[in-house]
Regions:
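Residues that mark the N-terminal boundary/hinge immediately upstream of a DNA-recognition element
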Residues: 20, 31, 35, 62-65, ...
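Alpha-helical residues within the helix-turn-helix
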Residues: 26, 37, 71
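Short alpha-helical DNA-recognition segment
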Residues: 29-53
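A short, Lys/Arg-rich alpha-helix, primarily the initiator
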Residues: 2-28
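Short C-terminal boundary/hinge segments that cap the last helix of small helical domains
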Residues: 63-67, 71-85
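Residue-level detection of the helix-turn-helix DNA-binding "recognition helix"
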Residues: 26, 40-41, 56, 85
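Short, basic-rich loop-to-helix N-cap that marks the start of a DNA-contacting helix
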Residues: 49, 56-68
Length: 85
């Protein structure tokens, strides 16, 4: 079998939900640490530093994390994927 290599382009974002996570977090007046603490109650463990990297689109996000973020932020999953043009 041929091996497929993943090409990493450091100039490209690793997720598209980061800016919306930040937007909804700030709308609620929450710090990154508070969001991390609230996620632990589900329990989904994303530390404050990982939330920062997620919001900066540096970190990838799993489907479980996306569902937990939407639930914790009180928004539909689709809202995390909305793009502002």
């Amino acid at each position: 079998m041929a091996r497929i290599a993943r090409i990493i382009d450091e100039d490209q974002p690793n997720n598209i939900i980061g800016p919306n996570v930040r937007k909804y977090r700030l709308e609620r007046g929450w710090s990154q640490q508070l969001l991390a603490n609230k996620l632990e109650l589900i329990p989904v463990y994303i530390c404050r530093g990982s939330i920062s990297r997620l919001e900066e689109q540096i970190r990838t996000v799993t489907d479980f994390e996306i569902a937990a973020l939407a639930e914790t932020l009180g928004v539909p999953i689709e809202a995390l994927f909305a793009r502002e043009d």
